[in-house]
Amino acid sequence: VFGGEPGSRLVDLLAKGAEDQQDVTDRLGYQVRRAVEELVGAFERLDRDSHRELLKGVGETEVYEGVLTVMMRLVFLFCAEERGLLHLGEDLYDRFYAVSTLREQLHDDASKLTEEVLDRRSSAWCRLLATFRMVYQGVAHEDLRIPAYGGTLFDPDRFPWLEGRQADGTNEPPHISDRIVLHLLDSLQVLRQGQEARKLSFHALDVEQIGHVYEGLLDHTAKRALKPILGLVGKEGDEPEVDLETLESKVAEGRDKFIAYLKDQTGKTERALGNLLDQATDAEKLRKLRVVCGDDHDLFERVKPFANLIREDSFGN
């Protein structure tokens, strides 16, 4: 990962011409969309574990809007910190509040402890919540003074469930893992194209360019699946999601028709799809599949025949 060099700034990348600009915006849009999916999924799992109390009364559209608001808050903070509008560079702010330094801190922890350990911690999410509150309400402390900026973007009462606040007075921050926060920050700070990873700077990025990068996110929303849905391999940014019952019905029509259906859905060749169906599923992939299926053995057995067709998330699961 390269940072701070000429050409690494997002504004420089966007200035390279219409074709390059489209490549950058498409790639960033894809990265951020995957991160949004992860955070939406995390809140869904926490809501399920809380017996539907965490998101009680919260509609699907509001969940998506709340998660998208988190991403836009992060973009705002990156821009503000890099323009010197906050206290980036001061020890107290850098260690406990800055979003620009948080990613490296989490990467250091992951290197020392492994990313899996980050799954069991949620201090980074609490730090983000504190920073969001700080920007909205301000801070008056002898070692750190920040005016209250207010505004709707950082208003904590727009999406109180982001903080774990519920109508009954419950106020416990949701356990969004440090690993997920790391992936959120990575999606915004690092442009990944093939084997190249380029650290981005938001310095001098104007509102129009931010809107150009993220406008595609407004075309999406979140829907709660009422039956098992499998995310299949496919063209990046256009990977299909198909319900398990449909896949099972297509298999029943015969191998040739099933492969033809998969070709239409994934864009892969019939030969490549045939190879995926024929190759043995390795033990590690089956282990991950069992984890995803939880205690539902019947679901695991139903999904198992399609294991090699399922795409991995950004965690490699």
Cite the ranges covered by each PLM segment.
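Charged, often flexible domain-edge or linker segments that flank or initiate folded functional domains
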Residues: 1-317
